[in-house]
Amino acid sequence: MKRLLLASVALLAAGCGHDYARSAAQIPVAPTIAAQPLPQVPNPPAPVAAAPAPQVAAAPAQASSRTDYSVPANWLCKPGTSNNPCEVNIDATIVKADGSTELQKYAGNPNAPIDCFYVYPTVSLDPFTQSDLVPGPEEFNVVKSQLARLGSQCRIFAPMYRQFSLGALRARMSGGAAVPTRGTPADAAADVDDAWAWYLANENKGRGVVILGHSQGSGQITRLIAAKVDGKPDQAKLVSAIVMGSTVQVPKGADVGGTFKSIPVCKTASQTGCVISFSSFRDNVPPSETAGFGLGRGETEAVCTNPAALGG
């Protein structure tokens, strides 16, 4: 079961960094979605391209308010919720190396023996610095494309959180006009912490859990794991940590240390309690020396695990 879960991470490798290498043969590349519309939000803004992981400034110590995760509406995906975007038809067309295709039917497993706790990337189109807790098409679409297929291996928990919005990130990176302030940067971290605490107290019941995120979500789970899991009793529950489009550091030549003090790098598909991390770039455009992710710093190097072949 755990081997299958780690192997299923290969599905994420097709597009969860910040630039896209050529896809390996025989992976799902064209989902075949049945006519099953996602929940609608009035007047959704036009879709925009994904952006790199934000390097968010140091947050104030206090959140502007706390979020109650006993309220089902504050979860994007959670077992038993209505209009769950992680429970849609995600049959896919497999394109093989010889060009032939095969329809891969998908079936979720509500009785999966482990859980997945996911924090999504920078996608919010809200016109303020911090997003609200009302999901829009952008949040629905990212969990459908990145996360939902793991529902065949784990129960999925994905909280809404007051993330640093895409508009705020663009303004910061371009030097353009700032977007209006709402809340504080500490709101995002407080939400992720509170969602994790509620999940542990009410849903975990001693089950193994995969903690995964992408981009801004990876920054949040890295902080969460370092503070709440690494070297703590809950580390025993960790099936794996999957940190995509961000950087986990280890001492050069080592498998443990650096970002996490006692959680090693995953080396085999059957290994548990370990971390998978990667950022993808075009094969002919490696990360520059000024890249915000994918590079080592000083005496450390960036973890770079191939999720489709953990043995190297």
Identify the role of each PLM range.
Residues 2-7:
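Sec-dependent signal peptide recognition
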Residues 13-15:
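C-terminal motif of bacterial Sec signal peptides marking the signal peptidase cleavage site
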Residues 17-19:
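Bacterial signal peptide processing site
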Residues 21-61:
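Post-signal peptide N-terminal segment of mature Sec-exported envelope proteins
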Residues 57-103:
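N-terminal module-boundary/linker segments of secreted carbohydrate-active enzymes
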Residues 73, 79-82, 109, 118-208:
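Active-site catalytic motif of lipid deacylating hydrolases and related acyltransferases
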Residues 186-205, 226-312:
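Surface cap/lid and interfacial helix-loop subdomains adjacent to catalytic sites
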Residues 213-217, 221:
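Gly/Ala-rich beta-loop-alpha elbow adjacent to hydrolase catalytic centers
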